[in-house]
Amino acid sequence: GIPCAESCVYIPCTITALLGCKCQDKVCYD
């Protein structure tokens, strides 16, 4: 997918999660 410029190492995807991004390999991906 496309990186969503948000990491999810310590906290889950927040803003980008609203855009449909999911956590993969410590980074939020579309």
From Swiss-Prot:
Disulfide bonds join 4-21, 8-23, 13-28. This is a cyclic peptide. One of its GO terms (biological process) is defense response. Pfam families: Cyclotide. The keyword Disulfide bond applies. Keywords: Disulfide bond, Knottin, Plant defense. There is a cross-link at residues 1-30 (Cyclopeptide (Gly-Asp)). Belongs to the cyclotide family. Bracelet subfamily. The presence of a 'disulfide through disulfide knot' structurally defines this protein as a knottin. Probably participates in a plant defense mechanism. This is Kalata-B16.
